[in-house]
Amino acid sequence: MSRALLSVRGLGVRFLGERSVAALSDVDFDVARGEVLGLLGESGSGKSVTLRTLLGLHAPRTTRVTGQVNFDGEDVLSLPAEALRRYRGGRVSMIFQEPGLAFDPVYTIGAQIAESIRAHDAVDARTATARALEMLERVQIPQAGRRLQAYPHELSGGMRQRAMIALALACRPLLLLADEPTTALDATVQIQILLLLRELQRETGMAMIFVSHDIGAAIEVADRIAVMYAGRIVEENAVAELVAAPRHHYTAGLLASTVGEAERGRPLATIPGAPPDLSAPMQGCAFAPRCVAAVERCRSELPPLVRDGARALACWRPRATGDGDGPRGPIGPS
């Protein structure tokens, strides 16, 4: 891989309070220019925390962030306030999971997009409004001129998400962070948004980190996938290789539990149990209590993330590369 646009090394996030929670631990990954990296995992695995950390959105008084985040040669975690403001929205932008909460309800869609443009580019109000209209047309919102004057609550969920994409791309970012952008949408609209995101990514050449708990959505959009569990990356590989031969037992379980893998007349595969409590001290592999292949070493010794070219794996007892598409039933201990 050529020099990465984004390089994350040893990233850790701990939320402080009555109970200290280790939300991220020793996270490493790179994103090249023009590449789409999928972050995949269950709720609570650290995907959204990763994105918010990349934008510096955590309250410093209640959050301890460690490690390094290097974006295009800059140390993001040490940026002063003004440089961080220019970085957010200008060079790196984010699509939030629920656009209804991300938009200000008392301003029109057009006003909010134009304001973002003027905050990062030296243009007048007329030019900013024209660019806002262009962005709404670009994300295929019908009657874009009329929608420019609409308030967020006047748009459907799918329209609001398209408007959110327009806002995120208005300043031509080098990296787009997409935090489960289709979760709140119906199946038909989900497909439309996924296709739109991929089309815009290819058209602009920007890099993207696509967060999802839906492995099917991640496969459609991403070039590579990093699988997260309990605040750590446990496996990373190119999409085709990850799907054809998952090495980590958690990855195999996610693949096996999709509807596409189901056999008629048989129940859907599941991963028994639940993710661990991240406020409690942890020994060994966090997935060990749910893993059929776990042995004593798995429970007592944390497996490091070992990289081999574009692949990475953290497992003491990985699946053989010829194991196929993953188990067809529960993969946890009986």
Go through the PLM ranges and name each one.
Residues 4, 142-146, 236-334:
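Short catalytic/signature loops enriched in Gly
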Residues 177, 181, 185-266:
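P-loop NTP-binding/switch modules centered on Walker-like glycine-rich loops
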Residues 63-75:
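Conserved ABC transporter NBD signature motif
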Residues 40-42:
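The feature captures the beta-strand-to-loop junction immediately N-terminal to the Walker
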Residues 170-174:
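A short, proline-enriched helix->beta-strand linker immediately N-terminal to the Walker B motif
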Residues 74-75, 127-146, 255-256:
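Conserved ABC ATPase "signature" region
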